[in-house]
Regions:
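Membrane-embedded alpha-helical bundles of polytopic integral membrane proteins
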Residues: 1-153
Length: 153
């Protein structure tokens, strides 16, 4: 009992230290950390959903979609790309929907629903951290990284 508590406490402290360190270090570390966390969280969600037996979502495509959504919103927020950066994400979502129809799976509509849920429930909140982290100053035409706002969440 005591050993398990100690192991969990040390793991928790390390996890918090990595998150805080990456957020405070620089924008690249922030992006790398949260794109990884987003993709792995979607992978775990897909694993849990697929265990039910009724649903079979494509974990690889949903992971790629979640990671790309984070990177696209990050690129848009730092003014590295325009709104056209979201076109590959839309193509990926359309591919996901069309592929479910032709793969002859048990419940294609339920698979769509859980795939979209993973994008909206997991990937989108992580991606919205970029909106908090990067402030655009139109007068100086620059973007600044503010680690305090994502850290406050």
């Amino acid at each position: 009992m005591k050993n398990n508590f100690l192991q969990r406490a040390i793991t928790g402290i390390l996890f918090v230290a990595i998150i805080v360190g990456c957020i405070l270090y620089d924008p690249l570390a922030f992006g790398t950390l949260f794109v990884t966390v987003s993709a792995l969280t979607i992978r775990e969600f897909g694993h849990l959903v697929n265990q039910s037996g009724e649903v079979s979502i494509n974990r690889t495509i949903t992971m790629l979609g979640g990671a790309y959504l984070f990177l696209a919103i990050m690129g848009f927020c730092i003014d590295a790309a325009g709104s056209k950066i979201f076109i590959p994400y839309l193509i990926l979502i359309i591919y996901l929907m069309v592929s479910e129809l032709y793969l002859k799976k048990k419940n294609p509509v339920l698979n769509w629903a859980y795939s979209m849920l993973s994008q909206m429930y997991i990937a989108l909140p992580f991606a919205m951290l970029n909106v908090l982290a990067f402030q655009n100053d139109p007068e100086a035409s620059s973007v600044s990284y503010n680690p305090i706002l994502p850290l406050s969440i």
